[in-house]
Amino acid sequence: MSMLNGRRDEAERTGRKVNVAILGAGSIANTMATTLVKMAEDSRYSSWIHPYAVAARDKGRAEAFAAKYGFDTAYGSYADMAADDNVDLVYIATPHNFHAEQAIMCLKAGRNVLVEKAFTANAAQARALLNVAEETGLLATEAIWTRYQPSRDLINELVHSGELGTIRSVRAELSYELHGRDRITNPDLAGGALLDVGVYALNFIDMAVGADHGRSIADIVTTMVPYSTGVDATNTTVLTYDDGLLATATSSRAVASDRSGVICGDNGYAVVTNIN
């Protein structure tokens, strides 16, 4: 178990920082490492965050990563890193198909987890992961950054102000053209536009009008155009809520879009120019 869990007062009194480890050493791991280093150097965060360890399947790659960013420890085994009692929080930075298995491994080893989006490849995996988090009493959450931006509060305030009237429909679209990437087209890696960028469109809808506001989904209809490999290149999901509100999310890796979100009420509408 992380030495910090249940000991917040003690940690603050003794100056014990959160030791963060990164599982994986790919491009998104580099982005997180850069952020962690900046936080550790920033007086607003330096008293509680410490970039501690990285693990990759190739020990040499992990060592090079640790040297580049100044991490204390490098592991050539994910399991060995998860077994390190100095690790408080593990950021899972591998392809989607590995997220559930690796997060569950870390939770069972006593580590809190921050899982890169998409959280898991499917709902069954998400339920299994969250069940283990509940059993262990540890944190398991998704690293979907739009949920933590100030714009979320602004949107909530607007929706609840009544200025738009009763919200009747929402549309969200996020598409980036990207070709020749195995992680996008390979079904074995849980590829596809939905898990790669579509989660942002669905997340926008949920934040703007969905479960965060007490609504329940009454019906879901989805359609997609696949790559030759079978995973979705472009997709659209239509959500009907219990109060009749209709929401549409579209995402693609085959084309580009304006990345906008539109919230429509019977008194007016609001446009978010970039939901990501």
Set out the residue ranges of the language-model regions.
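Short, conserved SAM-binding/catalytic segment
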Residues: F65-F71, L129-A133
